[in-house]
């Protein structure tokens, strides 16, 4: 079943094997350039996926040819003043919306993941890439800096020194280097990308959903909240999980006794 906007769609499997598996599909040929409209549609799709009870895990996909070549540069060049601020905000909100989906998310990366396209991939929990994919934090080549919290996400994974080198140079790098840097979690043949991402996501379809959501929020909070707020939020999620009846097997001793 699909809910279709112009460029972004939500597709939820109704098959018995993959019941609960959904796809957030960006389709704006030929490069999946990310315009303000695309970002708004991503926000709406991410919100829908987060709310739907029939969705347990999500694959972020740009199709079999390309993930995304980044921001719509012709559109960006026309923006001035308040319009530029709005564009920056909607980009950040879209990246944050994907990162905040309270379910396991896997980016299936094909072709190119450049600039904001790389940032969008980094918003997923895991990334599966074809062995021929080219990556790049390429904004500097257009006289820009990465937006949408890209610098923090890239630094979190690759470290400050490597993040600076990639951002300052804007150079392309291949999937093998991305794997070595931890930017992707698995590298497969180009034709196997979606299936590999589905296999990764499939492991979580039968998991305790409230607990998975709480665990994801807790890990993300390590990077986003001060310690006192993080501990308070963690305690609140712990109680909420048990209140929802998702506290695990009542007959099991959590301490192994």
Curated annotation (Swiss-Prot):
Principal EC category: lyase
Keyword Lyase: yes
Entry keyword Lipid metabolism: yes
Site (Important for catalytic activity): 139
Catalyzed reactions per annotation: a (3S)-3-hydroxyacyl-CoA = a (2E)-enoyl-CoA + H2O; a 4-saturated-(3S)-3-hydroxyacyl-CoA = a (3E)-enoyl-CoA + H2O
GO biological process: fatty acid beta-oxidation
UniProt-listed Enzyme Commission number(s): 4.2.1.17
GO molecular function: enoyl-CoA hydratase activity
Alphabetical UniProt keywords: Fatty acid metabolism, Lipid metabolism, Lyase
PANTHER family (UniProt xref): (7AS)-7A-METHYL-1,5-DIOXO-2,3,5,6,7,7A-HEXAHYDRO-1H-INDENE-CARBOXYL-COA HYDROLASE (PTHR11941:SF169), ENOYL-COA HYDRATASE-RELATED (PTHR11941)
Matches recorded under NCBIfam families: PRK05869.1
Entry's family note: Belongs to the enoyl-CoA hydratase/isomerase family.
UniProt function note: Could possibly oxidize fatty acids using specific components.
Name of the protein this chain belongs to: Probable enoyl-CoA hydratase echA17
Species per Swiss-Prot/TrEMBL record: Mycobacterium avium (strain 104)
């Amino acid at each position: 079943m699909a809910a279709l906007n112009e460029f972004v769609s939500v597709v939820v499997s109704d098959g018995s094997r993959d019941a609960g598996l959904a796809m957030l599909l960006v389709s704006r040929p030929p490069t999946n350039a990310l315009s303000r409209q695309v970002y708004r549609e991503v926000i709406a799709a991410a919100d829908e996926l987060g709310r739907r009870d029939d969705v347990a895990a999500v694959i972020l996909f740009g199709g079999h040819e390309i993930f995304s070549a980044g921001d719509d540069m012709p559109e960006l060049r026309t923006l001035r003043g308040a319009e530029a601020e709005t564009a920056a905000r909607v980009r950040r909100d879209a990246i944050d919306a994907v990162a905040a989906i309270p379910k396991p998310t896997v980016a299936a990366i094909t072709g190119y993941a450049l600039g904001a396209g790389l940032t969008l991939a980094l918003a997923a929990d895991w990334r599966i890439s074809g062995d021929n994919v080219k990556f790049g934090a390429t904004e500097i080549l257009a006289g820009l800096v990465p937006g949408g919290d890209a610098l923090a996400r890239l630094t979190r994974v690759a470290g400050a020194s490597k993040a600076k080198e990639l951002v300052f140079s804007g150079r392309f790098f291949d999937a093998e280097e991305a794997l070595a840097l931890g930017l992707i979690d698995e590298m497969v043949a180009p034709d196997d990308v979606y299936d590999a991402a589905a296999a990764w996501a499939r492991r979580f379809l039968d998991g305790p959903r409230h607990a998975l959501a709480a665990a994801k929020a807790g890990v993300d909070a390590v990077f986003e909240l001060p310690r006192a707020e993080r501990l308070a939020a963690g305690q609140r999620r712990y109680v909420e999980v048990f209140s929802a009846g998702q506290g695990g097997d009542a007959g099991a001793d959590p301490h192994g006794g």
